[in-house]
Amino acid sequence: RLSDYSGSLPFNPTLQNVFLFPDVLLDLMTNARYGMGSFIKDEMIDLAGFKEASDWCSNRSYFFNGAIAEPVNTRTYAADLAATHLLYFAEINGKFTLRPALPVSGSSFTAADIKGLFTVGNILEDSYQIEYLSPEDREPIEVSVSYREERTANDLTSDGSFPVVREALVSESGYAPLDTVSLDMTDYCTQRVHAIDA
């Protein structure tokens, strides 16, 4: 059905049952049995965007190690989880797309090409408004990210014979954070680097 897609679908769990979020979302959107496939047609999906997102997650080892056990609003779920994979989920030109939120070239970040400068001087009068954040909203924060650590081998004597919830604290160096924001990724994240990047 999705013969033009060259990501890791159909699911072939060769890497110890490790999946990528773009592939899971694409399957959820196109599968008529347990997903939205009876409502979302193939032509309503930007496969190139999903492929780019799948490559991005694969290159950065952003795996989706979880299950969708409860009914979810697909759009809300996709947008929320996309952000924790440094992706954005959108509808562009009538097609659902999932793309890296940062400019990328292959597996690395690239500088964005500047197309133009938009300021008060070159925009129609009264069509441009500048709004500044209050000083309280600009204070540095600390982010507490929870993720799941699991045993990587079948050796029962190794650490992690049961999943362990780990926490990573991320803050800007040189500043004392005034507030701590919590981000729970234990449902699907098992990589410390992924948790910190999110």
Regions found by a protein language model. Give the residues of each.
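Secretory-pathway-linked proteins and extracytosolic
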Residues: R1
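C-terminal extracytoplasmic interaction modules
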Residues: Y5-A198
